[in-house]
Amino acid sequence: MAMELFRVCLVVVTAIINHPLLFPRENATIPENEEEIIRKMQEHQEKLRLEQLRLEEEVSRLEAEKEALRQVEEEQQQLEAHTAWDLWTTLCMVLFLIIEVLRQNHQEGTFPECLGGDEDELSGLGGTLLQGLPLPNRATLDHFYEHCIRSTTGDATRTQEFVEGFVDDLLEALRSTYNGKTDMELEDFIGVGSMYENWQVERPLRCHLFIPFIPPEPYSFHPEFWCSSLSTPLERQGYGQIKVTLADGNPLGCVCGKAKLEEDMLCLLYGKNRGAWPSSAGCGEMEGLLCSRESSYLDVMQVMKWFQMALTRAWHRIAHKYEFDLAFGELDTPGSLKIKFRSGKSMPFILTPVIQCNDSDLYFILQLPKEPCGGGPASSAHWLLSFAVYEREFLRMTGKALPEGACHLSCLQIASFLLSKQTRLTGPSGLSDYHLKTALLHLLLSRQASDWKASKLDVRLQDLFCFLERSLLEKKLYHFFMGNHKVPEALGLPEVVRRAEPLNLFRPFVLQRTLYRNTVDSFYEMLKNAPALISEYSLHVPSVRASPPPKAVVS
């Protein structure tokens, strides 16, 4: 009963609560409120979007500033590192420069260790020198020199007199056809080389004569040294160019443009393009005239052709006076000539056209263009600077201060003899007689006069070979005159040469390893063969000496 009453009450209460009049419907205004809410939500969403964009921009700006700051820091670090590197590089360069200067001073002031001591110190070094290869003793050297070298002095004198007389006649024939307006004027010859320095031992004897020539008026030669330009490559050191100028110093075109030339005259001016030029004042009157309007430098090849043609003309004028023939000799030696006698014997000699450098004893000489190491073909406008006259004068001046019968030339003659025999045995190497003479000149300047007594021939010969050995091992043999401040001022060497950078004659060995290896091997083999070779020639002295040259027959 109670349960039924409770159910009835629950139904009544539920009906009252759900009656619409008691609780009005709240969603009657939903349409207006919903639009407002949606609008506000959209506005809020727009604000959120704008805020998001602002935050994104702020983040991007902060990241950009951070990246810029990082780049600035990196650049600053790189700059600091670069500055530190430049500082270290500069310090290293300064240090290397100081070391090089000290090394140069040390090399100028001292010589290889085998040159510094006296005879006792030298003999005490024993096998450390020249790979322990022994040289002949003094008695053997004296005997060899007296019987194989000194005895040929008379032949050298007679040969020299004969060649000089013939060359005088040849030059006189050239001068007889001289045209003062177009021809080069040839001056008197100058004797140079081993024949005129009294140490030649190679057979057959060969005289070497310089023939200076000058251009016709109003032209002049203006030498240009290699050391006047900072951009001169190493292979051009020791060379120069010859510019043809007017008397007032202004460069001008070739002589053939101003005068009528003979058919066999060559224009000697250097130029890139060769061939026949259009007809103009003189040039158009002959075909194939080797003349250039683009440059005023003398060309080595053209001068050689001109000189050979001039010698040929001169010989044809005087050939009837002599009972021998004259022919050109070695093709790779400009001015090489050979007198051929009817008996079959011959007498070689060299006539080299040269150009004097101002008023000095320096001469620019012909040298055929060669392929430099690692470069293109050499220019034929470059002339080799020769110190031959200064070398002859230095040996003469030094010889006067040495004891009577000094052994300096004897050392050079024996060394030259050994080198020539080794060359015939194994072929040519990178070592020449000029290197031997350069080494001797350095020794003469470094040692006292008393060290060159005749009784010290064996010690001085060992000095010479020790010097060459050290130079070969270091690949450095400096030219005696270029940049050498120790050369006596009495020689009158031009200041431009004294101030020049030293020239390393062994520089090719740095680039040509095969040549260097062959030269070193040949040098030590020469020393190894020296005792046996000298003993052999001392025992078997030739009984038949070279006969003096036939006298000229004048018809």
UniProtKB/Swiss-Prot annotation:
Major subcellular location class: membrane
Ranges in the topological domain labelled Cytoplasmic: 103-555
Entry membrane topology: Single-pass type I membrane protein
Extracellular side: 16-81
SMART domains: Mab-21
InterPro entries in the record: ITPRIP-like, Mab-21_HhH/H2TH-like, MAB21L/cGLR
Signal sequence range: 1-15
Gene Ontology CC entries for this record: nuclear outer membrane; plasma membrane
Coiled-coil spans in chain: 32-84
GO terms assigned for molecular function: protein kinase inhibitor activity
UniProtKB keywords: Cell membrane, Coiled coil, Glycoprotein, Membrane, Nucleus, Signal, Transmembrane, Transmembrane helix
Membrane-spanning ranges: 82-102
Domain of life (superkingdom): Eukaryota
Protein name: Inositol 1,4,5-trisphosphate receptor-interacting protein
